[in-house]
């Protein structure tokens, strides 16, 4: 059971993001120019829609695992409860927010067309994260589990707002 959580938390997001980074890297110079890891340089190149349809979901899920996107949120409560309190607070306050930042800065920034077309799928998943995290936090007795599930709910709300793709959200 712990091995499955470790896979979701460690190997899955890293693998998905690595595949996308390499795919974008090798497509960053379609005319034979210099390839780059600079996100501003890559953003100047139009990634083909077929590639965006593959890369956007992989990138969003990869970073979404860090942001406790449903159904990949299961690592978070166990991580919070087994960690020392200070680490648990850093985990909730920093690590999980990096998932949302990665979704925004990489997935949506580099692949906005696919983000507009496919966002409804992830809006459903983030809505489930918000509701499931909130109701799970309500029924918990352990403070660390309350923090963990409320963080799942909060990060779901952050990802939901990012997927709205407007300044108000």
Predicted segment positions?
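Short, small-residue-biased leader/transition segments that mark boundaries at the very start
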Residues: 1, 5-12
């Amino acid at each position: 059971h712990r091995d499955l959580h470790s896979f979701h938390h460690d190997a899955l997001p890293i693998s998905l993001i690595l595949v996308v980074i390499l795919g974008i890297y090798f497509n960053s110079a379609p005319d034979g120019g210099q390839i780059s890891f600079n996100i501003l340089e890559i953003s100047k190149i139009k990634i083909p829609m077929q590639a965006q349809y593959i890369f956007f979901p992989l990138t969003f899920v990869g970073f979404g695992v860090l942001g406790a996107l449903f159904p990949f949120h299961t690592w978070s409560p166990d991580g919070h409860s087994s960690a020392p309190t200070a680490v648990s607070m850093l985990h909730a306050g920093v690590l999980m927010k990096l998932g949302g930042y990665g979704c925004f800065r990489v997935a949506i920034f580099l692949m906005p067309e696919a983000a507009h077309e496919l966002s409804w799928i992830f809006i459903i998943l983030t809505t489930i994260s918000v509701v499931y995290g909130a109701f799970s936090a309500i029924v918990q007795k352990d403070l660390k589990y309350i923090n963990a599930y409320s963080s799942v709910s909060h990060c779901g709300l952050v990802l939901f707002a990012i997927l709205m793709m407007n300044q108000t959200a």
